[in-house]
Amino acid sequence: EAMDISHAAPFTFGSKIIAGDYKDLKDAGIIIITAGANQKPGETRLDLLEKNVGIFKGIIPEVVKYAPNAILIVAANPVDIMTEVTLKLSGFPKNRVFGTGTVLDSARFRSILGRHLGISPKSVHANVIGEHGDSEVLVWSSAVAGTTCVERLASQLGKDLDKVVKGSIDNEVRNA
């Protein structure tokens, strides 16, 4: 979780994050749901579906009870399906239930690419598209630092950004 939070640093603006009880959700405007089973080696995100649906069947009614007007953001795997599960379990309208999709993956991509180039991830603009997970795509062709293509910047800085390095970054983003 700490790694996820650090990878999300480019998006933070002084948020208040606490660990508490369901009753602490009273009057919450936005609730981020990260609960779920851990992915074991060899398991796919889809393998987590049955376990996480069971977990959500216990969580979502409590969330609805204490925060019936909140916006829900789902960040549990498989995130796209769990967002739909949350929508159905909550009974909330579609405009109040969102999944993180590849937002965290894009933040990881920016963070890891920034670290590799030795620059702030806040200067890196790079996206991951598609379904969160094994089929997601890192969009290298539009990755920039400021207004400079990352390949050009890497060359100017004397940093490798060849197929091997890109593969390593891709692997780190997917498997973080």
What are these regions (language model features)?
Residues 4, 31, 56-59:
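Short, well-ordered amphipathic alpha-helical segments that serve as non-catalytic structural scaffolds
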Residues 35-37:
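Conserved NAD(P)H cofactor-binding loop of Rossmann-fold oxidoreductase domains
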Residues 31-33, 74-75:
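Redox-cofactor binding/interface segments in oxidoreductases and associated redox assembly factors
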Residues 1-29, 43:
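Conserved N-terminal Rossmann-fold NAD(P) cofactor-binding segment
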Residues 90-96, 104-176:
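C-terminal substrate-binding/catalytic lobe of Rossmann-fold NAD(P)-dependent dehydrogenases
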Residues 44-110:
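Rossmann-like NAD(P)(H) cofactor-binding subdomain of soluble oxidoreductases
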Residues 39-41:
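N-terminal glycine-rich phosphate/adenylate-binding segment common to multiple enzyme folds
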